[in-house]
Amino acid sequence: MAQTLTHAVHMIAHGRVQGVGFRFFVRDQASRYSIKGWVLNRPDGSVEIHAEGPKDQLDEFIAVVEEGPRFGRVSDLEVDWVEPTNDYTGFSIEF
């Protein structure tokens, strides 16, 4: 049986992404795509995301995050592929 490789991505979402349920949306989508990691509001009004999982799932997750929730608007999504840490057992909202 082939082993599924874990990949990781670090993202910064800009736009109308705070006060619109964006972190909860990201957490729910992470669960949908079996992604592990975290999401965090940043003081500058952006949202930071670290996500780990299979590359195909991450690609789909990134596309959904870029689309954003109904009342939010992502004007720019910075995406950097990074080394996975494999430290996560789920996906959390950080404060």
Task: Set out the residue ranges of the language-model regions.
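Intrinsically disordered, low-complexity, mixed-charge
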Residues: M1-F95
